[in-house]
Amino acid sequence: TVIPGTNHARGYERYDGESELKDVTYSYPGSSDGDMISTADDLNKFFSYLLSGKLLKEQQLKQMLTTVPTGIAEIGRYGLGIYETKLPNGVSIWGHAGASPGFSTFAGGTLGGKHTLAINLNGHKTSHSNPFKNILLAEFSK
């Protein structure tokens, strides 16, 4: 995977209790969650088309959104490459998160695709089990 150009987000990490942040933008751990490089705008467009039914046939989307329990409280139920996050205000967000050194991301939106959000945090080690939930709650309470 290559990060093209220079106008892109940068990823940072702290290692072994060091106080100094290290730029790890170009490190590659060799796992699948670092294999897709995109822009927030493209991720929002993708989820808008997916969740509005413009990308897949109705039956395919229905199957994708059919979930099974994961046993992981932060994720809840998981479909085919997508999971539902139920916010405290009752809004359900469908999307997916990923992480690689220096980056934690989430992209998704509401069914119908009218409201989507892509989030990037510069660092993948957080003390919060779901670092996106408060951001999602703020955005999807509007």
Residue ranges and their predicted role:
Residues 1-11, 15:
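Active-site helix/loop module of the DD-peptidase/beta-lactamase fold
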Residues 18-142:
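Catalytic loop of the DD-peptidase/beta-lactamase superfamily, centered on the K-T-G motif
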